[in-house]
Amino acid sequence: MAVKLDPIHQFELKPLVSFGHIGHQHIAFTQSALYMFAAVGIIALITLVATRQRALVPGRMQSLAEAFYEFIASTVHQSAGHGSERFVPLVFSLFMFVLVLNLFGMIPYAFTVTSHIIVTFMLALVVILTVVIYGFMAHGVHFLDLFVPPGVPGWLKPLIVAIEVVSFISRPISLSVRLFANMLAGHIALKIFAGFVPALLAAGIWGILSPLPLALSVAITALEMLVAVLQAYVFATLTSIYLSDALHPGH
């Protein structure tokens, strides 16, 4: 019983298929990988179903898909500015991937993939590497103007450059921790309050208080649904802002 009530137990990785060991490291296909494959499959299926007809007068599914895409396209354009259209597919894919994974975590007994820092960090690393690679491809060494804001006095440039470099390097950390921490904390709180209900029901007369944690669990669940959507949007928005540096370094 103690294991079931452990709020951290839900984040434990469980190997589904083992591929042996490399040194002391166990290599396995876990439920985390399964949920990520499922998310990609669901997104691909919905996209194919929604766009299979490509009618001039769109149906409900096509209208919904277009609304989602146009919403992200608008976000990218507002955050990254001119020339950002080429990054809309990337940001849209990241948004949908994070959104579906977050919503998976709201299903009872499902696994919350985005509660693992390694997953969110790799997603953030994709963003930063895209910024760096495209920045150098499009602007060459002038991409480094990103670290030298215009109008800075010469004597102050070494300090400003150092601060800008540290800030840039910390971006994947802050981007990944923001998503990871929000999903982790919310699911821990939900598990704790949900665990109070059977505990109070088994405590005799104290069972009359069980509706209180039940109501809190419902409220936290609703809040977590909102957080799941908002965190996907925040991830997409920050990605767009970071991509603007690749498009317009030094501005």
UniProtKB/Swiss-Prot annotation:
The lineage of its organism: Bacteria, Pseudomonadati, Pseudomonadota, Alphaproteobacteria, Hyphomicrobiales. It is found in: Cell inner membrane. Key component of the proton channel; it plays a direct role in the translocation of protons across the membrane. Keywords: ATP synthesis, Cell inner membrane, Cell membrane, CF(0), Hydrogen ion transport, Ion transport, Membrane, Transmembrane, Transmembrane helix, Transport. Disulfide bonds: none annotated. The chain crosses the membrane at residues 29-49, 56-73, 87-107, 117-137, 159-181, 192-212, 218-238. One of its GO terms (cellular component) is proton-transporting ATP synthase complex. InterPro entries: ATP_synth_F0_asu (IPR000568), ATP_synth_F0_asu_AS (IPR023011), ATP_synth_F0_asu_bact/mt (IPR045083), F0_ATP_A_sf (IPR035908). F-type ATPases have 2 components, CF(1) - the catalytic core - and CF(0) - the membrane proton channel. CF(1) has five subunits: alpha(3), beta(3), gamma(1), delta(1), epsilon(1). CF(0) has three main subunits: a(1), b(2) and c(9-12). The alpha and beta chains form an alternating ring which encloses part of the gamma chain. CF(1) is attached to CF(0) by a central stalk formed by the gamma and epsilon chains, while a peripheral stalk is formed by the delta and b chains. It holds the Pfam family ATP-synt_A. Belongs to the ATPase A chain family. SUPFAM superfamilies: F1F0 ATP synthase subunit A. It is a multi-pass membrane protein. PANTHER family: ATP SYNTHASE SUBUNIT A. Signal peptide: none annotated. The keyword Transmembrane applies. GO terms for molecular function: proton-transporting ATP synthase activity, rotational mechanism. It comes from Methylobacterium sp. (strain 4-46). This is ATP synthase subunit a.
